């Protein structure tokens, strides 16, 4: 602000004063007076703003410079919602041929653009066009301030699309490669702010942003690394852009893996999330494992910092979808940490990702199922499941349903009392939890050496197997009715006299089975799955009658 004061004081010099119009001399005097008492003056009020405006619109560059510097200092200390009478003179100063005036005016505009209402007004008053022009300035300070202002403007959702279509993305992308680290930071920060909608991401990709962002990943500046990594992570949300990345950026995965080993937790976190988003595609699921990402992900998984744990477990969840990755993940030592994360009750997302990963790992191999069970996963699931949030219950019951497919481990699951937690969950408020729990019970009911647990749980807890079968047979959802009818057939075909007697004496079950079979009369067309339900119900009734006759 010293420059501002000295410039205003110079106007009192005799040889300079005749060059000023009366209103400009008055404005200089008024501004000096206001500045002497600056802590008590509202510079956005009528008289101070009038003085600043007169100087801003002066033909005299020294007075314009004073106004620009004053605006820069005032807005640094006092940011509030302002009207066009404040912003318009600042925008006018941006058009000055003088680099110092441009620099100070862009600082003032960037300060004002911290306020949401001001952000919208700057764009409404065509400030973007002026800032784009400033970004093309040969002066680094002007570039830096202009890009910083656009970064602020781009945090307002209603501005993002306007910026994307304004022609700003090309200059921003070029300035992201600037040799000045401040310009790089501001430019990559602005590009990041433009990655939060599909339409804007399309505009970014069309502007050639991807190769620039990838080239900056090895930057020595943590902020630039963070902005670029996060931008790539957001761009990788879209399948079409993942395809583009796969075609044009062969070093991307290895660069992101290296960033998981940096000293900055926020960069590590975003690198893992970027890999997670890339791993939505089968190609990347394989490449990430083949590129030796597992040791770094395991290290992050064992961190005490929740965002790092969440990012890494989310990445592992996606990677584990591919059958070829199941054994490498298990062999890399992930099972114990994943089972431990089931107890992370302070973050249900972590719980969901951990148990979903276990389910994926169990999908195609008896060896993997055995490893998961040996890692004490069943104990953890049984202990936690009834008190877990619904989203976690859904994943846990789905995992149990997969584990219950294995004939080798059904008796283990039953003897561990898993029915006692699954039965109450068949009456959950969540349709998914109901269905998964019933599917797990159905899987356990087939080809078991000992059905004593089903006998013990026939009437309890929570209405027992009996109550669950009645609810599901009564359901309008053919999938639920199918699970119940299929389970009844399995229990009857097991040939356990006491279990068969329970079913035979259950008039409600028999009545519901008859109602389902009756739908077959004079009806040649069925909704999805209904025909199978009718066939299974008929099979169940046949087995009941057969056992009764014998």
UniProtKB/Swiss-Prot annotation:
Ranges for the ARM repeats: 75-114, 116-155, 157-196, 198-237, 241-280, 282-321, 323-363, 454-493
Lipidated sites in chain (S-palmitoyl cysteine): 4, 7
Any single GO BP term: autophagosome assembly
InterPro entries in the cross-refs: ARM-like, ARM-type_fold, Armadillo, Vac8
Annotated keywords: Golgi apparatus, Lipoprotein, Membrane, Myristate, Palmitate, Phosphoprotein, Repeat, Vacuole
Membrane topology reported for the UniProt record: Lipid-anchor
Signal peptide: none
Residues linked to a lipid group, N-myristoyl glycine type: 2
Compartments, record wording: Golgi apparatus membrane; Vacuole membrane
Gene Ontology cellular component annotations, sorted alphabetically: fungal-type vacuole membrane; Golgi apparatus; Golgi membrane
Modified residues (Phosphothreonine): 548
A single MF term (Gene Ontology): protein-membrane adaptor activity
Pfam families: Arm
Entry-annotated residues carrying Phosphoserine: 550
Gene3D superfamilies for this protein: Leucine-rich Repeat Variant
Transmembrane residue ranges: none
Reported function: Functions in both vacuole inheritance and protein targeting from the cytoplasm to vacuole.
Family stated for the protein in its record: Belongs to the beta-catenin family.
Protein name: Vacuolar protein 8
Originating organism: Schizosaccharomyces pombe (strain 972 / ATCC 24843) (Fission yeast)
Lineage, highest ranks first: Eukaryota, Fungi, Dikarya, Ascomycota, Taphrinomycotina
Gene name of the encoded protein: vac8
